[in-house]
Regions:
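Active-site anion-handling motifs in enzyme catalytic cores
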Residues: 1-440
Length: 440
């Protein structure tokens, strides 16, 4: 089967986007050919480059595209338009995506000459049998809607209109805990989902959500594609220090000396909801500075490393400077980063996929909350004895409880690590069964 793969997010820094996009690509390409890839840069919230105005005729886009310095001028126009709209840029006259998907497709086709980077969206160019969407966390039904959700839904609608098969895999379906349930978006997407070959979600919460909110869909449940990396994480390759593996932004002089992974260590990251909950970056930095200092004090015999797993965790670079804590950079090669997490004694985080990477090596996690049910659902998936989430901005009392739980999990030692690792092996076998979906 010839496949167009939507949501290949390896172009992002985010550990989870890079890892699970690759894992799902490996699963679907085992017996199929991927003939087109639509990357996350242009389905996501902001391209920084889009030139579109609802009332421009097609000839305008063709004309400006011939201008020698168009790509530079376009960025300036984009910023000017954003300033004019002042927070109301998306789903406005300056965005091709709309709740009417036929209109969105026509808008896209019309503006392509002036936006050549969007060419990958044009499904007319591919000789393909099926469109596969890497659902990940794109379909959170927030108010206002996530742009990524509508763009990917538009592509599903278009593929179905062309008579192609559509597979929605590796998905999470959820409300946004920080905004209203978006019934309008659900009603729009339901007929698209109902025509798909399969709607496959990665955990029980999403399965229940789909049952409650979508009708007449072919619903299946497989663990996240990232669990298929069990063998990679548990092979013979060891990461003992950072000097051979650090990415460009982390390749400082100190990276040759400050990272010793041969001694017991603890890793700390942020949460996907920290930017929503906090009033300012300063507040985030202050809270995480206190958390890191408390962990360093409580675990004096352990190395402590910060892990910048996502663009939203960039504040950890400030925390690293204040607390003099080494930080593993966001552009660290993904398998090396995974090995580091997988061999920590404990991982404190509100991140979904990085927690899976850690768990594949048996590392127990202490979870903070996230932008959905995902940090709760992954604990259930891993069969944790107690499902526990801490506040994304933990106060002194919660920091003490985080440390207490971290100590307990470390003291459980090999027994707990082996239990987590064995569960991940089971989930690895389960997620690989997605290869059979294309044979049905």
């Amino acid at each position: 089967m010839k496949i167009v793969y939507v949501g290949d997010n390896r172009n992002r820094g985010n550990f989870g986007c890079r890892a699970t996009s690759t894992a799902l690509s490996q699963i679907i390409s085992k017996d199929n050919e991927i003939v087109g890839r639509i990357y996350g840069k242009y389905t996501n919230v902001d391209t920084g480059e889009l030139f579109f105005y609802q009332h421009f005729p097609a000839w305008i886009y063709k004309t400006v595209s011939k201008f020698k310095y168009w790509k530079y001028l376009k960025k300036g126009l984009y910023l000017f338009n954003r300033m004019l709209k002042k927070g109301h840029y998306y789903f406005s006259n300056f965005d091709f995506i709309d709740y009417d998907f036929d209109k969105s497709i026509n808008n896209l086709i019309k503006c392509l000459p002036a936006n050549p980077e969007l060419k990958e969206f044009d499904l007319r160019q591919y000789d393909f049998d099926a469109l596969v969407v890497n659902g990940e966390g794109s379909f959170i039904f927030a108010t206002p809607p996530w742009r990524e959700c509508l763009v990917e839904a538009m592509l599903m609608y278009w593929a179905e209109k062309l008579g192609k098969k559509v597979y929605y895999l590796n998905g999470m379906l959820s409300d946004d805990p920080y905004s209203k349930h978006n019934e309008k978006t659900i009603r729009l997407i339901n007929p698209i989902f109902s025509k798909a070959e399969v709607i496959s979600v990665r955990e029980e919460y999403s399965y229940k959500y789909a049952k409650e909110n979508f009708s007449n869909i072919k619903l299946k449940h497989y663990p996240d594609a990232l669990f298929s990396w069990y063998d990679y994480i548990n092979d013979d390759f060891k990461v003992n220090n950072a000097k051979y593996i650090m990415g460009m932004s982390g390749a400082t002089d100190n990276s040759f000396y400050d990272f010793d992974f041969s001694k017991p260590y603890i890793c700390i990251s942020g949460s996907s909801s920290v930017g929503v909950v906090a009033n300012s970056k300063e507040e985030i930095v202050n809270v995480y500075t206190e958390l890191v200092q408390d962990v360093q004090s409580a675990f004096a015999d352990y190395n402590v490393f910060l892990v910048d797993v996502c663009e939203g965790d960039n504040f950890l670079n400030d925390v690293a400077k204040i607390t003099n804590t080494p930080i593993i950079s966001i552009d660290t090669p993904i398998l090396s980063a995974a090995k580091i997490l997988a061999n920590a004694r404990v991982y404190i985080s509100g991140r979904y996929h990085p927690s899976i990477l850690a768990s594949l090596g048996g590392t127990p996690c202490v979870f903070m909350s996230s932008n959905s049910h995902k940090t709760r659902s992954v604990q259930e998936l891993l069969e944790y004895e107690e499902i526990k989430e801490f506040n994304v901005l933990p106060d002194k009392d919660e920091r003490e409880k985080i440390i207490e739980l971290a100590k307990y999990k470390i003291n459980e030692g090999k027994n707990l690590r082996n239990k987590i690792q064995l569960r991940c092996l089971e989930l690895s076998k389960e997620t690989l069964k997605q290869q059979d979906l294309f044979k049905e």
